[in-house]
Amino acid sequence: MAGRCGARGALSPQLLLFDLPPALLGELCGILDSCDGPLGWRGLAERLSNSWLDVRHIEKYVNQGKSGTRELLWSWAQKNKTIGDLLEVLQDMGHQRAIHLIINYGVSWTPSVQTHHELPFPSFPPEVKHACRENDPGPLEPANVTVDNVLVPEHNEKGTLQKTPISFQSILEGTKHFHKDFLIGEGEIFEVYRVDIRNQAYAVKLFKQEKKMQLKKHWKRFLSELEVLLLFRHPHILELAAYFTETEKLCLVYPYMSNGTLFDRLQCTNGTTPLSWHVRISVLIGIAKAIQYLHNTQPCAVICGNVSSANILLDDQLQPKLTDFAAAHFRPNLEQQSSTINMTGGGRKHLWYMPEEYIRQGRLSVKTDVYSFGIVIMEVLTGCKVVLDDPKHVQLRDLLMELMEKRGLDSCLSFLDRKIPPCPRNFSAKLFSLAGRCVATKAKLRPTMDEVLSSLESTQPSLYFAEDPPTSLKSFRCPSPLFLDNVPSIPVEDDENQNNHSVPPKEVLGTDRVTQKTPFECSQSEVTFLGLDRNRGNRGSEADCNVPSSSHEECWSPELVAPSQDLSPTVISLGSSWEVPGHSYGSKPMEKRCSSGLFCSEHEQSKKQ
């Protein structure tokens, strides 16, 4: 960034970053590199980088002793950014020292202080047209939008509009100016209060505004959620009662859900009753319908981007309601298309519901919601949290997927929620299989929400059958020795060809051999023994040629298996068919070759006897 305008007083906010004076650039990099946290180069990277992968590259430069700020500004300058753009970013960071440094170099710049009254409010069309689905109650006609005090009209049975009795003053009086005693929930950027207005309970979602520089960021997320709730209506999407932008307060008003979140009911928070399997599958189907409806809206699909068990509310009839659309995005209905977004440093807990392509590259698509919904299915089946407490720092998804790959689908059945009576195996196996496909590592391997909903609806009837239909053994895998803990015992097939049958010691082949319960076994193949002592003569040969008719009649002598002085082996050649008394394997006699060169057959021995 060689400076062609090095004289002070000659700098303009429209000056490109490539023309930034080297002295000013060096001092600016020194200030940002010396700071840690949000005022350092990391805080600058959160606003200039497209994904966390770019931040990782900058970290490598920093580890090599280079300036992270210089690398960031160099990459950003290639987008034709100006000094004025840099000052806007520094103002958003709240870095007054860096701002004063640039201004002291002669840059005439007036900071733009905007409030929410000056920000453009979205203009909604008089009539919103979208694809009418089976459960779609019809298009919603948004009310006239103003900035000071906006009320969202409700719909009666005929679909006409009627005003609500909610006012911002009634909310202030009902919550005593948002006192902590009425706080019932809290998120990353909002707080939830309960208020009773005219014998009706409501939940007020108040966006946090601790600093003025956060207002712009929260305003965008406020508009994102507001736009989704105004444009789209569904029985399983939480309806909006009212919203306000009053005295720098951004709040959304919803009907109060008495049964709380799905996460709290699965964890039985405050001693609540566990949900039955019938309720759980009904909740999954309802949320799948809501997500599928948003994915198929026209002309743009809606990506929720924040599907989790904590964002699923249950009403007094245990009907699910999907909520929290602050991270929603609109994109054209192209099946193979995905978009890249800027990630924020917050929401780390929700990252457990996000796939790898979002965490690494910030890629967002409809398959992102499918992945998050698959995690919710695993929570519903097991009743566990996304990150298990014991063992620590183990994700539920990784544990179940590893079990499926190592031991098969049936190994996951031991993790079913034990707080309620067990469900049929066929029902749980189908849900585990569906969850495994939803949380596949590659996005192209995940099903669409249409396929997920169809699979859930076809699985629901199997819950009402007490007996499971017969299944093939091919679906049952042999376990790995590394995964034999806390899982039902599974028979392991043993290959006799891999067993090395060595000569037993004398202590084992002595008198204890008669009382041994497990007989020795050998395959019908060529068997080689060490040569017997030639000094035994014919007596040893005759004894060796006798084949015991039963394992209980065997009487082994230690001397019979003692190795001879020469190393020539004694080979017993078994024909393709031979017969043992009491067993009919064939009629061909067995021939034995002894170390002394004598040949004898079973037939000849019978004649001698």
From Swiss-Prot:
UniProt entry tagged with the keyword Secreted: no
Classification via Pfam families: Death, Pkinase
A GO CC term assigned to this protein in UniProt: cytoplasm
Subcellular location: Cytoplasm; Nucleus
Major location category of this protein: cytoplasm
Example GO molecular function: protein kinase binding
Record note on quaternary structure: Monomer. Homodimer. May interact with IRAK4 (when phosphorylated). Interacts (when phosphorylated at Thr-110) with PIN1 (via WW domain) in response to IL33-mediated (but not TLR4 ligand LPS) dendritic cell stimulation.
Keyword line: ATP-binding, Cytoplasm, Nucleotide-binding, Nucleus, Phosphoprotein
Organism placement in taxonomy: Eukaryota, Metazoa, Chordata, Craniata, Vertebrata
Domain comment (free text): The nucleotide binding domain binds ATP with low affinity.
Death domain ranges (all copies): 41-106
Tissue: Expressed in inflamed lung macrophages (at protein level). Expressed in dendritic cells (at protein level). Highly expressed in liver and thymus and at lower levels in heart, brain, spleen and kidney.
Function of the molecule: Putative inactive protein kinase which regulates signaling downstream of immune receptors including IL1R and Toll-like receptors. Inhibits dissociation of IRAK1 and IRAK4 from the Toll-like receptor signaling complex by either inhibiting the phosphorylation of IRAK1 and IRAK4 or stabilizing the receptor complex. Upon IL33-induced lung inflammation, positively regulates expression of IL6, CSF3, CXCL2 and CCL5 mRNAs in dendritic cells.
PTM annotation (Phosphothreonine): residues: 110
PROSITE patterns cross-referenced by the UniProt entry: DEATH_DOMAIN, PROTEIN_KINASE_DOM
Keyword Cytoplasm: yes
Protein's UniProt name: Interleukin-1 receptor-associated kinase 3
Domain Protein kinase: 178-463
Consequences of knocking out this gene: In response to intranasal administration of IL33, lung inflammation is reduced compared to wild-type and is associated with low infiltration by inflammatory cells, especially granulocytes, a severe reduction in Th2-type cytokine secretion, including Il4, Il5 and Il13 in bronchial alveolar fluids, and reduced up-regulation of Il6, Csf3, Cxcl2 and Ccl5 mRNAs.
Sites of Phosphoserine modification: 480
Site (Cis/trans isomerization of proline peptide bond) location in chain: 110-111
